Structure formats: C-alpha cells, structure tokens
Amino acid sequence: MKISRRFTKAGKGPYAQIKWEKRISEIRNPDGRVVFRMDDVIVPSTWSQIATDIIAQKYFRKAGVDPSKAELWRAFVPADQQVLAGPPPREGSEHDARQVFHRLAYTWLLWGKKAGYFDSED
C-alpha cells in the first residue's frame, strides 16, 4: 500500500506546523463540585475546550503507560516546543495530545507492518 504525504513535509516532524498550549480539563456535578480535574493538558491551540475535555477525560491513559515508551513521542516535537511539553506531571499518565496521537499511529504502523500492508519504510 502506498500512502501519499498530505499534511506534513519530508524531514519535519508531524507537529511542526501546530501551535500547542496548556489547558485545564474539569468535570463538575450539577451542584458545581469538581469530580475530575487535570491540569497542564497540552492540546493544539485551535481545539475547543470541549475537544480538550474529551481527549483528557476519555482518551488519555490515566495509568499503566510503559515508561520505556511514554516519551518516544518527544522525538517528533520541534525544539522550540520542548519547553511547553515539559516533564509528565503524573507518573504513568498521559497529559499531552501528542502522546495519544503517537500511541495510536505507532500501533497502526506496527499492525500494518505485521500484515505486510506497506510497500516501503517511507
């Protein structure tokens, strides 16, 4: 299978064109009490607060992130954005949308390689 490059440029990481920012995600009961809160959630700056809440509350792994794989996504973060990423605030938990994107893309890549779907490494 051949997949044409569409949204990235050769030699640049997939996140180079995206501006990122830290946010807070909360769930509140009808009475106003906070039942979930995650600080320092990093998402694309163009995302709505609802999109931020969905990824933080539904898609971030809260525990069990393999330490040997947890930081692999950082290799794709441009140098000028490394400061924003910072260290993970919670051990074993995802806090950055790039971690989710990398986890999913890497899984699909491994499945595709195993099934022989790709014509080349590129």
Region spans (language model):
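Extended catalytic cores of very large enzyme megasubunits
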Residues: M1-D122
